[in-house]
């Protein structure tokens, strides 16, 4: 029996901070809002749906947390149609963290699938880059807000 390969976005990066700190950066919106979305209705908790907002674009999304393993793994479902986003945290011997983000479950085909994979790969890469700058150096790069300035794109409308 042949296995069909599932289209998956995968991005990764070494973050020079302890795994517990990197993990909390995704659980706690008081931290996440420094590098990703601008507002959240709450912390990630299993079985709970929160709303993430990007106020500069006047868009929001509902995020369902499916699974959490402290300092190891977070699985969420979000988007329309919904896809799964897994965050995998691996502690490295030097006290840093290797973070992997996987996004899969796309109900698209052809050019629409290619476009979604491309957009989400770029988007999650931007998230990790912002996280790295913030946690390692305390710098808020404003990458998400600068990705689609009003003057060049009518994003989300």
Question: What is each of the regions a protein language model found here?
Answer:
Residues 19-20, 66-71, 89-98:
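A short, structured loop/turn motif at beta-sheet edges
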Residues 1-41, 157:
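Hydrophobic ligand-binding cavity/cleft-lining segments
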Residues 27-28, 37, 70, 129, ...:
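Residues at helix-coil transition
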Residues 22-26, 32, 50, 65, ...:
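Hydrophobic pocket/interface hotspot
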Residues 77-126, 131, 144:
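Beta-strand/loop substructures that line and gate deep hydrophobic ligand-binding cavities in soluble
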Residues 133-157:
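Short, highly charged C-terminal tails/helix-capping segments
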Residues 10-14, 53, 64, 88:
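Generic structural detector for well-ordered beta-strands
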Residues 39-84:
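Glycine-rich portal/gate segments that line the openings of hydrophobic small-molecule binding cavities
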């Amino acid at each position: 029996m042949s296995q069909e390969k599932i289209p998956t976005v995968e991005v990764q990066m070494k973050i020079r901070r302890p795994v517990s700190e990197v993990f909390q950066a995704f659980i706690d919106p008081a931290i996440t809002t420094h590098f990703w979305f601008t507002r959240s209705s709450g912390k990630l908790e299993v079985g709970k749906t929160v709303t993430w907002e990007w106020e500069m674009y006047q868009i929001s999304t509902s995020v369902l947390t499916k699974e959490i393993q402290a300092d190891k793994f977070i699985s969420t479902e979000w988007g329309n149609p919904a896809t799964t986003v897994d965050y995998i945290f691996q502690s490295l011997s030097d006290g840093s963290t290797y973070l992997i983000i996987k996004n899969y479950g796309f109900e698209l085909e052809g050019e629409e699938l290619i476009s979604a994979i491309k957009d989400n790969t770029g988007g999650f890469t931007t998230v990790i880059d912002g996280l790295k700058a913030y946690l390692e150096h305390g710098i808020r790069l404003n990458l998400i807000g600068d990705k689609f300035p009003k003057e060049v794109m009518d994003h989300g409308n």
